[in-house]
Amino acid sequence: MFTTVRSLTAAVALAFAFAASPALAQDHHIVTPPDQVKFGPAPPFLPPGAKIAVLQGDPSASGPVVLRLQFPANFVVPPHWHSMAERLTIISGTLYVGAGDTVDRAGSAALAPGGYAYLPAKMHHYAWTKAGAVVQINLEGPFDIFYINASDDPRKAPGTR
């Protein structure tokens, strides 16, 4: 288990390195106009197609982290949990969020721009889109993700990016 956690932490650190570097300096204020938010491919712990921008912090280290995730149409983040709480704010599009061990589209909450969700640590949850969405996630690092069903973990899929 500890080897898996260490490997996950190392993988997260490497995956975020390209995106996190401008946000790592925390000794001054950060102002990022919308046209300067730079998205890149999300790390392999998310299904292919997602993009990420690290606005503040280092997701692989302790401390405050602010991420933006861009999901394409018909995107699903399968049921999973984190050891830290997540605070989601919808920037654009509609993100559907639900709790549980299976994706229940009828039981999901539709969050439009300005919508907010608080997901406590270890809460089993999932998210999906119909037409795409951009969501901001605030959390206390280090970031981790544990899929309920191992077969849903994109890091274990053949041909993982």
Where are the model-predicted features located?
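Glycine- and acidic-residue-biased ligand/ion/polar-headgroup-sensing regions
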Residues: 72-75, 81-102
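N-terminal secretory signal peptides that target proteins for export/translocation
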Residues: 1-5
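Double-stranded beta-helix
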Residues: 30-32, 106, 126-161
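Short acidic-glycine-tyrosine-enriched beta hairpin
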Residues: 58-60, 95, 101-122
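Bacterial N-terminal signal peptides
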Residues: 9-20
